[in-house]
Amino acid sequence: MVKLKNRYILMDILFDEKGDVVTESAIYVALCKQIGILFGDYGMAAAKLSLSVKVFDAGTATTIIRISKEFAQRLLSTIPFVCKIDAISVVLQVLFVGSSIRSCQRALLRINRKNLYSNYITAKTKGEKKDIIEAIRSVTGNVKFENTFNG
């Protein structure tokens, strides 16, 4: 028996306006609709068999989508064409493609840590820097700068 292999796509949803919120089902419908437009009935039917929104965090507008390995490239080529979800203008930004949810979670932590360190470097006041250091400590337990800051 052959093991089915999946790909997990970590995406960030960027909204035109602050305060817009979408749901997991709306993301699924928008992706299926766009796959149908680009690849026809066969593409939509093949993708629907394995396409699912596994994780969606409305607070950070980050989502993890699962699809079979065979159709991952089709989904990745479809994502830039998704412009609206539930009549809300959005931009979908692929952050990472991995073979497990855990690898996507690790990638998200790595991305967020880099963002915090870059915010630290661009902070103008000592108070801002102190707040960012405390945020990094609360999340990771330690602070280490990897070739981003000397001193």
Predicted regions and their residues:
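Surface-exposed, low-hydrophobicity interaction/linker segments
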Residues: 1, 12-54
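C-terminal low-complexity, charged extensions that often adopt amphipathic alpha-helices
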Residues: 2, 99-151
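Short structural boundary motif marking the start of a folded domain
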Residues: 5-9
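Intrinsically disordered, low-complexity regions enriched in proline, serine, glycine
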Residues: 43-44, 75-77
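The conserved glycine-aromatic submotif of the RRM
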Residues: 57-64
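Helix N-cap motif at beta-to-alpha junctions
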Residues: 66-73
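A common structural junction motif
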Residues: 80-90
